[in-house]
Amino acid sequence: MQSVVFVTGNANKLREVQDIVGNALPMLTCHQLDLPELQGTTQTVSIHKAKTAAAILKTPVLIEDTSLGFVALNGLPGPYIKWFMESVGHVGLNAMLHGFDDKSAFALCTFAYCEPGHDPILFEGRTDGLIVHPRGPAGFGWDPIFQPCGFTTTYAEMDKDLKNSISHRYKALALVKEFFQSKSDLALHS
C-alpha cells in the first residue's frame, strides 16, 4: 500500500498520533505544509485542507483538525481554539465561561484522508468533559483546562497512555485504523 503523508507542523500532535496508531497505518510520513485556514465547521476546514494538501503534494494525505466547544457558548471557540489559545490562553478561556453555570465542553477531532483528485473521507472522535481551571503541565494546547467526563484529572494531568486511550484523537484514529485495515484487506483479496 502507498505511503500516506500526515500533514502537520505540530510535533506534539505527530508524536501523539504515532503513539496511538503504532504501525497500523501504511508508512505514515510527516510533512509541514502551510495551508490556508478557512472559516467554518471543523468538517469544512478538514475537507478543504485535505483536498488542497493532496493536490499540492500529489500523494495521499491525512490531515487533522481539532476543536474545543463550550456548550454555554453554542460550541465556540470550536475550530478557532488555536487562535483563542494564542490570544487569551488558559485563563482567558476560563474567563469566557464566567457568569455561566454550564462549564461543559466537548473536544472534537476530525481526520480527513484524501487521495489526489478524490473527495476526502472524514473520521471524527468526540470526548465530552468540563472546562476547569488550569491543572497539569502546559505543554500541549488546552489539555490543562479540559477534564473528560468520568475523570477527576485534566488531559494534562493524565498519564500519556491513559490520555491516548480515551481522547477525542484516539476515537477518531480508531476509525482511521479501521478504514486502513479494511483497505488492506480488500487489496489482499484482489
Swiss-Prot record:
InterPro entries: ITPase, ITPase-like_fam, RdgB/HAM1. GO terms for cellular component: cytoplasm; nucleus. One of its GO terms (biological process) is deoxyribonucleoside triphosphate catabolic process. It catalyses: ITP + H2O = IMP + diphosphate + H(+); dITP + H2O = dIMP + diphosphate + H(+); XTP + H2O = XMP + diphosphate + H(+). Binds 1 divalent metal cation per subunit; can use either Mg(2+) or Mn(2+). It is an enzyme of class 3 (hydrolase). The keyword Ribosomal protein does not apply. Keywords: Cytoplasm, Hydrolase, Magnesium, Manganese, Metal-binding, Nucleotide metabolism, Nucleotide-binding, Nucleus. Its cofactor is Mg(2+); Mn(2+). ITP binds at residues 8-13, 49, 65-66, 82, 140-143, 163, 168-169. Its EC number is 3.6.1.66. Pfam families: Ham1p_like. It is found in: Cytoplasm; Nucleus. Mg(2+) binds at residue 37. One of its GO terms (molecular function) is nucleoside triphosphate diphosphatase activity. Homodimer. NCBIfam families: RdgB/HAM1 family non-canonical purine NTP pyrophosphatase (TIGR00042). Pyrophosphatase that hydrolyzes non-canonical purine nucleotides such as inosine triphosphate (ITP), deoxyinosine triphosphate (dITP) or xanthosine 5'-triphosphate (XTP) to their respective monophosphate derivatives. The enzyme does not distinguish between the deoxy- and ribose forms. Probably excludes non-canonical purines from RNA and DNA precursor pools, thus preventing their incorporation into RNA and DNA and avoiding chromosomal lesions. Belongs to the HAM1 NTPase family. This is Inosine triphosphate pyrophosphatase. It comes from Batrachochytrium dendrobatidis (strain JAM81 / FGSC 10211) (Frog chytrid fungus).
